[in-house]
Structure formats: structure tokens, C-alpha cells
UniProtKB/Swiss-Prot annotation:
Pfam families: DHQ_synthase, DHQS_C
Subcellular location: Cytoplasm
Similarity field: Belongs to the sugar phosphate cyclases superfamily. Dehydroquinate synthase family.
Catalytic activity: 7-phospho-2-dehydro-3-deoxy-D-arabino-heptonate = 3-dehydroquinate + phosphate
Known EC number: 4.2.3.4
Broadest EC class assigned to this enzyme: lyase
InterPro entries the UniProt entry points to: Dehydroquinate_synthase (IPR050071), DHQ_synth_AroB (IPR016037), DHQ_synth_fam (IPR030963), DHQS/DOIS_N (IPR030960), DHQS_C (IPR056179)
Protein name: 3-dehydroquinate synthase
Binding site for NAD(+): 113-117, 137-138, 150, 159, 177-180
Cofactor binding note of this UniProt entry: Binds 1 divalent metal cation per subunit. Can use either Co(2+) or Zn(2+).
UniProt pathway annotation: Metabolic intermediate biosynthesis; chorismate biosynthesis; chorismate from D-erythrose 4-phosphate and phosphoenolpyruvate: step 2/7
């Protein structure tokens, strides 16, 4: 089994990102490996997942943990962003109480970004913090949501407004789990991969440009997929290590997310999934950067073409409420002193942050995205 370990050397809780095809079978032994774990984990493990993911991978994960000597239980939540609520967290708490989970116990998130965010927040807050492990099964979660310790749930007024920074003990990425991922969800993850190419890793962007097909797993050569996963995870680890709690640099990881979150909110989290909204946010951010003379038209067009090639949306619906965007943007977590901070590219592989974006520039960018 080919294995890659990427360290995330945070001072309070360093951990490893393990990338390995077939790695689910090694989860139990890696959690017992003291070279990977700074503390000895307790026997009780609760795996949180959703029914679809559990059907495919639950038995493998449960067997791996049991064979390593853990006492394993599982708890299933419905799939989807609409269930990422405090009510779902309460259900995890209730089950944790039934199982008498202790501070040495471990919550394992087996699933996509929604499951990871909720499980992490439950781990951060149950008994003021218990062990937490990420086992992402979607591309988006593998390259973004599972790394860096952001956890939380949505509030009716905005996305991820309730949350905490809480680092996992291990992130296990098994590319084989992408075989059962819906094509639309694969494309959603590719939006985050494209983001890393724009903000951090020009070579990754060029690798993606060189791929004939970036829109489906089955068209992605295994060595290219491994390179994409490794480069994306390394980019996220590099940024998080320098700025764990988003005091400065880490904000660049929100490229495409400022307007993307507003699009998700204004369309009721139903029309676009998270990755699609991020893609639309990147299109808008590129237009804003060009209008402000921060970015060249040529580079913006390269990004646009890559997003289109990947099968991600670049247009908004004709009835999209542009006039409501300003109010939603003010609930964004990056707002500082009442000003919305935008992450904008200056060249491929480089990014900057500004709170000096005139409202008419934002409106112009969004109007240009309204579909025919």
C-alpha cells in the first residue's frame, strides 16, 4: 500500500494527514500507533456518518477499529447541508451521553464536509473536548474541510456562524472512497482544488489545465488524482500551520467563499452545493479583481475556462436577488469593523485581501453572471 504522510506541525496539537488507497483498513492500527498519536486514545470510539456512506464503508471502518482493540459504536445522521444544525449536534450529544463517552474517547467523522464539521464541533464541545478523527469520503472534504480544525454548524441567518477551531488527531484520506462519490459531488470538490491552484500552487493549476477531463473521477488517472490530493492537502497544511485561527494568512483559503456563501444562503442551500457556490464565488472574485486592475483578463479567463471544463457553474439564475447580497455579506465571518474583506487574486498562485471593494463593483460582477 502506497502511503503519504503530510505533517501539520501545530504547536498545541500536531497531527498527520495520511493519504493511502485502501487506508480505511489501517485506521485502527494508525490510531494505536504512538508515532502518529501524541496521546493514548481511550477504548470507546463513536463513528458518526450518514446512511449512504455507512452502507459502503461502515463495516470496513468498524472492523479496522475493533481489530485494534477499540469498542466501536456508530451514529447516523441524514445527509445534506440542511441538517447541519444545532439540533443535529444535540442528537450526537444525547448518544454520547447514552454511551458514557469520556474525555479519552474518540469521535470519528466518516463522510463529507457536513459530517466532519458537525462531528468536530460535537467533539470540541462534549466534556469540553474529546479526541476527534477525520475520515473524509468526498473530494471536497479530503482537500479542504477535513484539514485545519474548522468545525461548526449553520445558523438560519448564515453559514458556519456557530463553531470552533478544533484540530483532529488524524486525517485519513483514502482515494478509493471516491469511487462511490456522485459525479456532481466530485466536481464540487474540484472547485476547492482549483482554488488552491489560484491562491497558492501555480503548478497544481497547470496540472489541472493539462488534464483532458477534470469533471469525473473515472476519467482521472490514479497518479494525477494522487498528485491533486497531495498538493491540495499540502497547500492547506502549509497555510494552517502558519495561521491556525485565521488571524491573517488563513483568510486566503476563503477565496470564492465570501460571495459563494451569500449565493448559498440566498438560494436556500438547495440550488447549488457548496463547491458549486465556491466556483461561482471565484468567478465573481475574478471579475472584481479585473475591475480593480488587480488581475489580468488573461489569467481570469484561464480560471473561467478551467471551471467550465470541470463542469462547474459560471452563471447565476435570472431571478437571483442581487440586491440582497450586501446584507448577507455583512454576516460573513471575515467582516471586520463593518467592512467586508475580499480575497482577490493578483496573479495565478498569489492572492491578496482588501476591504476596499465598492458596492457597484460587486453588483457589476454579479450582473455579468446572470444567465440568459
Amino acid at each position: 500500500m502506497q502511503q503519504t504522510f503530510i505533517p501539520v506541525p501545530l504547536p498545541q496539537q500536531p497531527y498527520q494527514i495520511a493519504i493511502a488507497s485502501g487506508g480505511l483498513t489501517q485506521l485502527g492500527s494508525w490510531l494505536q500507533d504512538r508515532s502518529l498519536q501524541s496521546v493514548k486514545l481511550g477504548q470507546k470510539v463513536l463513528v458518526v456518518s450518514n446512511p449512504q456512506i455507512w452502507k459502503h464503508y461502515g463495516e470496513i471502518v468498524q472492523d479496522s477499529l475493533a481489530q485494534a482493540g477499540f469498542q466501536v459504536e456508530h451514529f447516523l445522521l441524514p445527509a445534506g447541508e440542511r441538517y447541519k444544525t444545532p439540533r443535529s449536534i444535540q442528537k450526537i450529544y444525547d448518544y454520547a451521553l447514552d454511551l458514557k463517552l469520556e474525555r479519552s474517547s474518540t469521535l470519528v467523522a466518516l463522510g463529507g464536509g457536513v459530517i466532519g464539521d458537525m462531528t468536530g464541533f460535537a467533539a470540541a464541545t462534549w466534556l469540553r473536548g474529546i479526541n476527534f478523527v477525520q475520515v473524509p469520503t468526498s473530494l471536497l472534504a479530503m482537500v479542504d474541510a477535513s484539514i485545519g480544525g474548522k468545525t461548526g454548524v449553520n445558523h438560519p441567518k448564515g453559514k458556519n456562524l456557530i463553531g470552533a477551531f478544533y484540530q483532529p488527531r488524524l486525517v485519513l484520506i483514502d482515494p478509493d472512497t471516491l469511487k462511490t462519490l456522485a459525479s456532481r459531488e466530485f466536481r464540487a470538490g474540484m472547485a476547492e482544488v482549483i482554488k488552491y491552484g489560484v491562491i497558492w500552487d501555480l503548478e497544481l493549476f497547470e496540472v489541472l489545465e493539462g488534464c483532458d477531463r477534470t469533471n469525473q473521477y473515472r476519467y482521472m488517472p490514479p497518479h494525477i488524482l494522487t498528485e491533486i490530493l497531495t498538493r491540495s492537502a499540502q497547500a492547506k497544511a502549509d497555510v494552517v500551520t502558519q495561521d491556525e485561527k485565521e488571524a491573517g494568512l488563513r483568510a486566503i483559503l476563503n477565496y470564492g467563499h465570501t460571495i459563494g456563501h451569500a449565493i448559498e444562503s440566498l438560494t436556500g442551500y438547495r440550488l447549488f452545493n457548496h463547491g458549486e457556490a465556491v466556483a461561482l464565488g471565484m468567478v465573481a472574485a475574478a471579475d472584481i479583481a479585473v475591475q480593480l486592475d488587480w488581475w489580468s483578463v488573461e489569467d481570469a479567463q484561464r480560471q473561467h475556462q478551467l471551471i467550465q471544463k470541470t463542469g462547474l457553474p459560471t452563471e447565476l439564475p435570472a431571478d437571483f436577488a442581487i440586491e440582497a447580497v450586501a446584507d448577507v455579506l455583512l454576516t460573513d465571518k471575515k467582516v471586520k469593523d463593518g467592512k467586508v474583506r475580499f480575497i482577490l487574486p493578483t496573479q495565478l498562485g498569489k492572492i491578496d485581501i482588501t476591504d476596499q471593494v465598492p458596492g457597484q463593483v460587486i453588483v457589476s460582477a454579479l450582473k455579468g453572471m446572470i444567465g440568459q
